[in-house]
Amino acid sequence: VSESNPYRLRWQQDAHDVLGEFLAAARKENLPALSWTIATSGALVGDVDSLNSTPDGMRAAFEAWTGWLNARGVTDRMRRDGVTHLYAQFRRGEGATEVRGAIRADIHPPFDEEPS
């Protein structure tokens, strides 16, 4: 096992702790559920659910979380295939226990619409 493994595990534990705070706040503030991933770098990524939401619902979920997190670097780009990609970065904590992450959403056009 690499010497850097203890660091990676600590970073993941820090992200796990922050995720626990996020889930508690989501219950309290009625924020929508996201699919969360903790990377080996300790980055925490929340993806808006595309299977159980409408395009408007996905955008609303993205905006709810980015607003609550005071996220920055928010981007809203439409790809050639008509998919809108939303992305924003956030930070939680300070110093050695700071956790960085992102909120993402890929909003596909409704099936009855052709991409332009």
Residue map of PLM features:
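Structured alpha/beta or helical-core interaction and ligand-binding surfaces enriched in interleaved
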Residues: 1-116
